[in-house]
């Protein structure tokens, strides 16, 4: 990367974006040392202007930003980093530091990613705490059985052309399939990658 360090006075603005949801999480700054550390460790490290030192996001909270990809803008003076965030990004507990932004315009598919993270967080939880935790506790066979049941019910609803019921059953199917994927340590990203692979053949 050919960064124009002189233009940015040795502090590069860095936009952090969630690779799964495309949500902008925060803005920070990097000097050359912070960028080198980020590239080496694949975790985002900033230069803190208030503390006057390097600061790895998550070093105290455990909410790291794992680097997936990065790209400079056309003027080589702003960096975009795509990340897989571990936990919330904002110190307020919000997923994004831009939490005050009205999110009604976000694409509906972003919700699926958030649902997937919520379902993943239920693994190993007290079975009494939620239906999802109960499913995990009952094991893979029970989860797979529910996927089969919901698949049949979705097909039956579609067969009789009941749109409202088809939507409800499809929602149940997607939910249980998400649980099954997480139980197998897989995600919708794995499924999407396979679809892309088939599409390009």
Curated annotation (Swiss-Prot):
The molecule here is called Histidine biosynthesis bifunctional protein HisIE
Source organism: Pasteurella multocida (strain Pm70)
List cellular component terms (GO): cytoplasm
Q: In which pathway does it act?
A: Amino-acid biosynthesis; L-histidine biosynthesis; L-histidine from 5-phospho-alpha-D-ribose 1-diphosphate: step 2/9; Amino-acid biosynthesis; L-histidine biosynthesis; L-histidine from 5-phospho-alpha-D-ribose 1-diphosphate: step 3/9
List the residue ranges of the region (Phosphoribosyl-ATP pyrophosphohydrolase): 112-201
* InterPro entries the record matches: His_synth_HisIE (IPR023019), HisE (IPR008179), PRib-ATP_PPHydrolase-like (IPR021130), PRib_AMP_CycHydrolase_dom (IPR002496), PRib_AMP_CycHydrolase_sf (IPR038019)
Q: What Enzyme Commission number(s) does the record list for this chain?
A: 3.5.4.19, 3.6.1.31
Recorded superkingdom: Bacteria
Which reaction does this enzyme catalyse, per its entry?
Answer: 1-(5-phospho-beta-D-ribosyl)-ATP + H2O = 1-(5-phospho-beta-D-ribosyl)-5'-AMP + diphosphate + H(+); 1-(5-phospho-beta-D-ribosyl)-5'-AMP + H2O = 1-(5-phospho-beta-D-ribosyl)-5-[(5-phospho-beta-D-ribosylamino)methylideneamino]imidazole-4-carboxamide
Q: Which PANTHER family match?
A: HISTIDINE BIOSYNTHESIS BIFUNCTIONAL PROTEIN, HISTIDINE BIOSYNTHESIS BIFUNCTIONAL PROTEIN HISIE
Spell out the residue ranges making up region: Phosphoribosyl-AMP cyclohydrolase: 1-111
